[in-house]
């Protein structure tokens, strides 16, 4: 399960419907061009939390079909609706996903006992493995190393997608849980995360920048920090330009420039303006 995983983008048409042809093209681009090890399906990058249960299921089906067993697949099934999370966990396990993942329950201020109950309910409903999706800056849920340890007592909870900038906590977790998978979740921090011993990374920009992501990861693992830093500098220049132009819209526009029907974002995300489109063309030309 280790390696470089793209947090899969989803193509929508102008009316917000899933564009199956475009989604399949994004999946093939990730596998054939970006050379990723796996796909993280149904996460923030997939605009998941704006989708119906049926739409989520269809995306999971398309990804499984189009990946053709060539890469590992992780299904993000987490939801503030626990019944939906369990339903999606069962659905994706039956489809054959290699693991499931679940974001910490958000919006309401759940205490840790409620969070633990949430994870145990999901993983105990299926014969599969679970990766915790920790993204405190969006969920407001910050868990301590002691709380992670309590969750990891369940052998079916095999790791965490660590989307945070707390490198002290990351280092403490690496030391405390040598047998658990830790995936870096911030693309712009891959080098320091790799030096601290993560097992891989899951990122939105890998949909276009997967090759550089692997270069950083492999160079840092070999101790070639100079090369890794050089590629991280270029990557972070790219990420800065993307963020300044609109994250998901710009990644999709770059893919469009590369011949992939990446489509539109789901409302209430805004449609790309002419200025954003022109800037994305410049970004594509500059970095690819």
Swiss-Prot record:
<comment type="pathway">
    <text>Amino-sugar metabolism; N-acetylneuraminate degradation; D-fructose 6-phosphate from N-acetylneuraminate: step 1/5.</text>
</comment>
<dbReference type="GO" id="GO:0005829">
    <property type="term" value="C:cytosol"/>
</dbReference>
<feature type="active site" description="Schiff-base intermediate with substrate">
    <location>
        <position position="161"/>
    </location>
</feature>
<feature type="active site" description="Proton donor">
    <location>
        <position position="133"/>
    </location>
</feature>
<comment type="similarity">
    <text>Belongs to the DapA family. NanA subfamily.</text>
</comment>
<feature type="binding site">
    <location>
        <position position="185"/>
    </location>
    <ligand>
        <name>aceneuramate</name>
    </ligand>
</feature>
<dbReference type="InterPro" id="IPR020625">
    <property type="entry name" value="Schiff_base-form_aldolases_AS"/>
</dbReference>
<feature type="binding site">
    <location>
        <position position="188"/>
    </location>
    <ligand>
        <name>aceneuramate</name>
    </ligand>
</feature>
<keyword id="KW-0704">Schiff base</keyword>
<feature type="binding site">
    <location>
        <position position="204"/>
    </location>
    <ligand>
        <name>aceneuramate</name>
    </ligand>
</feature>
<keyword id="KW-0119">Carbohydrate metabolism</keyword>
<feature type="binding site">
    <location>
        <position position="163"/>
    </location>
    <ligand>
        <name>aceneuramate</name>
    </ligand>
</feature>
<dbReference type="InterPro" id="IPR013785">
    <property type="entry name" value="Aldolase_TIM"/>
</dbReference>
<keyword id="KW-0963">Cytoplasm</keyword>
<comment type="function">
    <text>Catalyzes the reversible aldol cleavage of N-acetylneuraminic acid (sialic acid; Neu5Ac) to form pyruvate and N-acetylmannosamine (ManNAc) via a Schiff base intermediate.</text>
</comment>
<feature type="binding site">
    <location>
        <position position="45"/>
    </location>
    <ligand>
        <name>aceneuramate</name>
    </ligand>
</feature>
<keyword id="KW-0456">Lyase</keyword>
<protein>
    <recommendedName>
        <fullName>N-acetylneuraminate lyase</fullName>
        <ecNumber>4.1.3.3</ecNumber>
    </recommendedName>
</protein>
<dbReference type="InterPro" id="IPR020624">
    <property type="entry name" value="Schiff_base-form_aldolases_CS"/>
</dbReference>
<dbReference type="InterPro" id="IPR002220">
    <property type="entry name" value="DapA-like"/>
</dbReference>
<dbReference type="Pfam" id="PF00701">
    <property type="entry name" value="DHDPS"/>
</dbReference>
<feature type="binding site">
    <location>
        <position position="187"/>
    </location>
    <ligand>
        <name>aceneuramate</name>
    </ligand>
</feature>
<dbReference type="InterPro" id="IPR005264">
    <property type="entry name" value="NanA"/>
</dbReference>
<dbReference type="GO" id="GO:0005975">
    <property type="term" value="P:carbohydrate metabolic process"/>
</dbReference>
<dbReference type="GO" id="GO:0019262">
    <property type="term" value="P:N-acetylneuraminate catabolic process"/>
</dbReference>
<feature type="binding site">
    <location>
        <position position="44"/>
    </location>
    <ligand>
        <name>aceneuramate</name>
    </ligand>
</feature>
<comment type="subunit">
    <text>Homotetramer.</text>
</comment>
<dbReference type="GO" id="GO:0008747">
    <property type="term" value="F:N-acetylneuraminate lyase activity"/>
</dbReference>
